[in-house]
Amino acid sequence: MLKPNRVRAAFREGRPSFGVYARIPSTATIELLAHAGLDFVRIDLLENHIGPEMLRAMIQTAHAEGITPFVRVPAVDPQAIRMVLDLGASGVIVPEVESAADVAAAVRAAKLPPHGARRVGLTGLDGHGRVAPDEYAAWASEHVLLGVQMETPGALRDMDAILAMPGLDMVLGGRGTLASHLGVPGQRDHPKVLEAEARLMERARQAGKIISVTYLPVRDPAQVEPVRDWVARGIHSVALGLDADFVHVYRRLLAAVAPAASGERQS
């Protein structure tokens, strides 16, 4: 059934929302993330393969457990955008947009009229007929969010046109991709990358968009401090890495309790 989008709710209440990217194709992972107290999960189809049936099950589990499900699609693909929303996602993340035209195509695919041209296909979110179409449309207009990752030179050049676009709800960085474009591949925390991201986030904030950054504090505890800094600066949403990052916790634990054994396993 229809539930509020926790990212939208947090934004309106003036507090940050927190979540992670999910790459493990498992409903159990979604359940655990919900019980960790996170607000959202971004199921990742860009750097992972999750089939439609598992994707639908993961989205349904998220709704049942009270964690808001987003899906990151592989590209600016209207068919993929419509598919994940018809499966029940409360939001879609579109990576590597190159231009205002890319974002306009995403808006058309993700949004109902008047901003878009999405044709609604309900797959259980309507309670199999218990929710009237007009009620679903009102809910979707309010709670289904479209976010784009502005991580390419083209997107940064078209920044003003993109940020002025009706129907775009959220702007995300992408420091890994941005680092490559700025000539410092692999250096997500290079000053040039951080400066470009901060400039983008401030412009997006001024445009009234939800702004979101991604850090990896489970993988690298030193990144806790930058997250705290963003929170103090009023960031709206933070992705705290990946579901699979738990492996780094056990690597550190193993190194602490049995350093020799840890070294043998890594060699």
Task: Describe every region a protein language model picked out.
Residues M1-S267:
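Expand to "…catalyze enediolate/carbanion chemistry for C-C bond making/breaking, isomerization
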